[in-house]
Amino acid sequence: MSAPQHALSPEFAVGLRETLLQGLGRELEITKKVLAAIPEGKRDYRPDPKARTAWELAWHLASTDVQMLEEIADRKFVLEPRFKEEPKNVAALANWYEAHFPSAMDRVRKLTPEQLCTPVDFYEAFSLPVIFYLSFVNNHSIHHRGQLSTYLRPMGSKVPSIYGGSADEPWKG
């Protein structure tokens, strides 16, 4: 069976990149608020024995978002975690994310139109033009940020506004 062909022009890929990166820039601010809301003394909170701790989930969210952007820029996906040293506390994690996520987005912004259209293997599961993986970063971030936001109130924290107000941070439209 041959790989599916994608009718993707370089011009469309550039426009799609800019649209997706603008959205990711907005998501960065929301994710940073959720990360910063983790109570330092409750990092080991785990809602279920099968669940990750709040800290494990937060580091996975932050580091994998950045790693995926870096892998898009490199046009190569690897299973090995890129970032070995975790930040030491919640404030450092939020700052790490705020520093690394935009610089990784800048690397993606520098890809040529032709590079954006180049098919890249995704962990040996399938291959798509590299531009399409930006939506994976967005989905990954939203998925794990949603999980983490459900940990906040049971940990004694406040849930920030995400896509509208929360009981703790009402929308001020």
Predicted regions and their residues:
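Helix-adjacent hinge/juxtasegments
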Residues: E70-L111
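Hydrophobic packing residues in well-ordered alpha-helices of helical domains and bundles
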Residues: L20, L24, V90-Y97, F101, ...
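Short, solvent-exposed, charged loop/turn and helix-capping segments
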Residues: I38-G41, R109-L111
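Acidic catalytic patch
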Residues: R109-E124
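Short, contiguous alpha-helical
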Residues: S2-A3, A7, L21-L35, K42-F83, ...
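Short, low-complexity N-terminal intrinsically disordered segments enriched in polar/charged residues
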Residues: S9-E18
